[in-house]
Amino acid sequence: MSQQTYSLEGAGEGQVNITDASGDITIVGWSQPRIVIYADEDDQPEAQWQGNVLNVSHVHDAQLRVPESASVSIERAGGDIEVVAVRALRIGMAAGDTELSRVGELSLGTVAGDLEIEQAGQVSIDAVMGDLEIHSAAAVNVGRVNGGAELHRVGPLRIETTMGDLEVHEAEGVSLGQVFGDAELHHVGGDLMASTIRGDAEVESVNNVQLEKVSGDLVIRDVQGSVNAVVQGDISLHKLPSSQSHTVRADGDVALGLDPGPVTLNIQAHGSIRWDRSLGLTVQSDTRRQLVARLGEGGGEINVNAHGDVVVYPAGEERGRRGRGRHGWVMAGAGEGPRVPPIPPIPTIPPMPSLGGIPVAGVRRPPVNLVEERSVILKMLAEGKITAEQAARLLDALGDA
């Protein structure tokens, strides 16, 4: 293996531009003020060095050492990419898997394989055709993930489309477009907003929750703010804060755990409505399918509309809601309250607003010249720089752009 070395002039940070690579690329930052390219003797890339900028082309398999202060740009890569410890990184198109760690500003176009990121600053991604995994990032903005997505310890998170399952642990606010699998979100420091979740959803430790549509079941635990949700399955709400206003609609059953505190209940159900006697509710209207009740004076309001059954119990007694309750159940319309005219309809859930002046889950992408990109991919295939499988994945990715 031979090497090419380029020393920085003055206090320059360094810039590396790789226009096309047919093999695997490994780039590692170091404290030295120089750039070194390691490659086989027969596969030396073409390099031009001018003004602390290194332009590299015709790369097969290569390893590069660059200053940690350097910015790196990879236009197209036919193999796998690994980058460690650089100030900024931009990748236009990657046919293989991509692993990135300790990267400052990160901008990615299309990754045809899996993408793994650890310790990054601002992250912007157009499309990942495989799975996405991120551990620690200042902010994340994603257009499309064809596989599943797993994120830990991130700042504000926006994802437009996730075709697989989504799992988030610790985020400073989450904005989602469509999730075609299940969604699991824990410890969201800000608000959670989602347009569509086609599987089940589980939410824990979050401020405000707004879900326009959940096709499966919904479980919410430990909410600090309000909940607005439309669910086609069952809803389980554990410990809703009584000081907030909530509106939920379910095609299935609803289980509601009340936090001790003043609140007004407005419940409509096609099935039965039951509540635990220990709650001490003051019933205002009680029919077989409707209940208006109050706990204390003032507080928030909880609006429930269910096609199935509704059960209300003290927060923290989830097991009791399936049995008799601590002091037995009271059932609406069982003769313990007068029949009254229908109560006013439950308020509709407003459309999901923008977050911070940016459209929800929106990702701004530069325009793509599809004809030019397809020509480049086919040329790389003809020259043997990428395999037929890699070319097919890249062409499929362009078709989704």
Q: What is the role of each PLM region?
A:
Residues 1-401:
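Intrinsically disordered, low-complexity terminal regions
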